[in-house]
A protein has these predicted regions:
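Conserved positions within compact, well-structured domain cores
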Residues: 19-204
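Positively charged n-region of N-terminal signal peptides that target proteins for export
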Residues: 1-5
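Bacterial N-terminal signal peptides
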Residues: 7-17
Length: 204
C-alpha cells in the first residue's frame, strides 16, 4: 500500500478544516459557514436573522433558507450578531482587492451555482455570493411610483450587500454583483430598499 506524503496530508486536512468552519448565532441558533479572506473573516452565507422589518426574497419563506433575508439599511446596521458588523467601505475594498480587483472580483466572489444565463462564478475564495435580488422601498398606497419600486426583482441574477456607509443625500452604499459580468463594484440606493447582509469580523 502506498501512502501520500505527510505534507500533502497536512494540506488536505487544513483545507477540510477551512471548509468546515462555522459560526452559530446565539440569538436564534442558526449556523453560518464562515471564511477568512485576507485579514477579515466573512459570513459565507447571507444573514437570515429575523428582524421586524426583514423579508424573504420574492416574499417566499423557502427562499430565506437558501438566500437569507433582505433588510432595509436601518435594519442592516444592527442585524449582525455581537462580534460581527456590517461591512464598511474599507472592508469591501479589501474584499474586492483580495478577490482580484474590481474587474475580476465578481468571478471569484460569486457562488459556483444558482446564477442564471451561465453567470455562475468560480467561488475561488469561498465567499459564495448568492443572487438573492432585492425589493424596492415599501410602497405608499396610491403612489404609483412607489408601488412599482416596492416589487421584488433580480433573484438568480443579482447580489446586493449593504455597507454601513451612507451618502449625504440619504442613500447608502452596497456591493453589487451581477450574472452578466465578472466585475464587482459599489453603488448607492435608497436606504428603504431591501438588500442582503454579509457580516464581517476582524481588523483590516
Amino acid at each position: 500500500m502506498r501512502y501520500a506524503p505527510l505534507p500533502i496530508l497536512l494540506l488536505f486536512a487544513a483545507l477540510l478544516s477551512a471548509c468546515s468552519e462555522s459560526f452559530t448565532d446565539p440569538r436564534d441558533g442558526q449556523s453560518y459557514d464562515i471564511v477568512k479572506i485576507g485579514s477579515l473573516t466573512w459570513f459565507a452565507e447571507n444573514l437570515n436573522f429575523v428582524t421586524e422589518g426583514s423579508v424573504c426574497p420574492e416574499g417566499d419563506s423557502r427562499n430565506c433558507d437558501r438566500y437569507g433575508r433582505l433588510y432595509t439599511w436601518d435594519d442592516a446596521r444592527t442585524a449582525c450578531p455581537e462580534g460581527w458588523h456590517l461591512p464598511d467601505s474599507a472592508d469591501f475594498a479589501s474584499l474586492i482587492e483580495d478577490a482580484g480587483g474590481p474587474a475580476a472580483a465578481g468571478e471569484s466572489l460569486k457562488s459556483s451555482s444558482g446564477w442564471f444565463k451561465k453567470g455562475n462564478g468560480s467561488d475561488a475564495l469561498g465567499f459564495n455570493a448568492l443572487p438573492a435580488g432585492y425589493r424596492g422601498a415599501v410602497e405608499i398606497p396610491g403612489d404609483a411610483q412607489s408601488e412599482q419600486s416596492a416589487k421584488y426583482d433580480g433573484i438568480g441574477g443579482y447580489a446586493y450587500f449593504w455597507s454601513a456607509v451612507a451618502t449625504p443625500d440619504d442613500l447608502a452604499y452596497y456591493l453589487f454583483l451581477d450574472f452578466s459580468s465578472k466585475a464587482a463594484g459599489m453603488n448607492a440606493f435608497p436606504k428603504g430598499d431591501y438588500r442582503s447582509v454579509r457580516c464581517v469580523s476582524g481588523v483590516k
